[in-house]
């Protein structure tokens, strides 16, 4: 079996990162899971979230890699769970072997309908109706949801108008590996 080279992983990460203009966080699944304490494993054949509540334009996308102590003076560093990652500029992607992508989005108050949700995902190539410049979109504002690139099933989360939801993702281009928080 052939393997992907490190440079091909950086290339794939750059391709994804360059979709930022059409990249949106999606939240959905308002109805309960069969077992609320144990959401089902995500199905890789899924093409859209269940019961989409809305979409929010991502705020930040960057190449990244595992943190090294020497990074503090060279590049920005972000925390993801209990781990640190270094944000790498595109021009240094190959040199730094940055084959991960950091994605950050924020939903503030009631810019999308409030209430419970159980799924989050990242869409690329989303097309809004009438070239809308809005950053928060309802499903009715969307002509084409594009490609659901990544998603996660979760236990119930509740958003109220007083809550700021900040979602961060580290997407790795390595096969059969995911980054745990």
From Swiss-Prot:
| Position of the signal peptide | none
User: What's the domain of life for this entry?
Assistant: Viruses
Q: Where in the cell is it found?
A: Virion
Write out the entry's keywords from A to Z: Viral baseplate protein, Viral tail protein, Virion
Q: Which InterPro entries match?
A: Gp8_sf
Alphabetical GO CC annotations of the entry are: virus tail, baseplate
Q: What does this protein do?
A: Putative baseplate protein.
Q: Which family does it belong to?
A: Belongs to the tevenvirinae baseplate structural protein gp8 family.
The identity of this protein, by name, is: Virion protein 3
Q: Which species is the source of this protein?
A: Enterococcus phage phiEF24C
